[in-house]
């Protein structure tokens, strides 16, 4: 016979505190005080990433600089590409990204917390490259070039996925 547990469960328990997001303080989910619905409608991926990392929405100059930074961090080390080539074609893309970021962390060790912002931006920049490199190699036997002139993450992803500039 099992005993039925009674009570509030975890209701009212604080699991942690963060300034990144809130739920319910301003009608639903917010990132750094900005309603998620407005961000989804009006902001780009890079603007939201900047907001989460730097605690403010970027002005145009800051956004241009941030996009340029991410663009410079997109390429993958050859040793990571070799690992991605070994992942089966039927793997789930989330598993590929987990393996890719884990391997990248071993290749480019963070060392200490003074490098954490660079490591975070490197991971953000490489996610489209990791999953697309694996996909193109495992499904089409193509060893693709990950460098292009697209300034946005979405543009970069679409360009390397389809092999041409997005329209």
Question: What residues fall within each predicted segment?
Answer:
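Hydrophobic alpha-helical bundle cores within soluble ligand-binding/oligomerization subdomains
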Residues: 1-167
